[in-house]
Every structure is written in structure tokens, then in C-alpha cells.
Amino acid sequence: MKTLICKKKDIIQISNKLAKGENRRVALFTSKELLEKAKKKGMELINKNPDLNDIENALDKNQIPLVMIHMKLLHKEDSPHWIVVTGIDNKSVWINDPYNKKGKDVKVSRNDLIRMMNDLKLYSKIEKRILIISRKE
């Protein structure tokens, strides 16, 4: 797993690409592109399997966790997908999901988020979960 600290402009670039309706290839390309860009900029990449504790820690530090999930459970689509986690408690996780009609503060269970993160390997052949943590500017 990669945990990546990136700048806000990198997140905007992801959002702009995904907002244009590009799909699976963009999600896969963007993750590779960001990792390469991060390495070149000297950002710290932590090779570990991110979990809900990493997401909770980021939220506690007022940081923005972006998580790549697989869309099968949430949207019945066979594609990787980026979401932003906005809140978490003992039972639920709140996400901003640009693919969802509601968009903001979509509530999912903790177990469903873990499953969607794990489904990346099962359905998309992405070897590891991907979590990007951005600092608020």
C-alpha cells in the first residue's frame, strides 16, 4: 500500500480528470501518475497496507484522506474509483463521492469501506490499497 502526502493542486488535477467523465483508465493512470510525481518531488511514500486507523488519524490531524476503492459494491460498476473520506465513527464512514447523485456526505459502513478497498485487488488487479493524505492549505 502507498500512503502519499500530496499538495492540493494534485487533488484538483485528479478531480478535473474524473469530472470529465473519464473512467477506469484515468483512475488507474492517475494513481500511477501521482506516485511518480510524488517520488520526483521528494514526497514520502510509505509502503504499507492503509487501514481505517490511517484514515482516522488523517481526519484527526485535519487532513484530507482520498481513498481508491472499487465501485462494484457502491455503484455496481467494474472500475476503480476515488472518494474523499469526510468523517468516521465506530459504525460508519462519510464520504464525498462524485459518482453518487447525492455527492457529499454519503454514509457507508466501516466494513463496506474496507471491502471496497480490498475489492481493488480482487476485481481491478491493483496489488495494494491506495490512500492519499493531503494537507489542507
Regions found by a protein language model. Name each.
Residues A27, L59-D60, H70, K76-S79, ...:
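Noncatalytic regulatory segments and standalone regulatory/sensor domains
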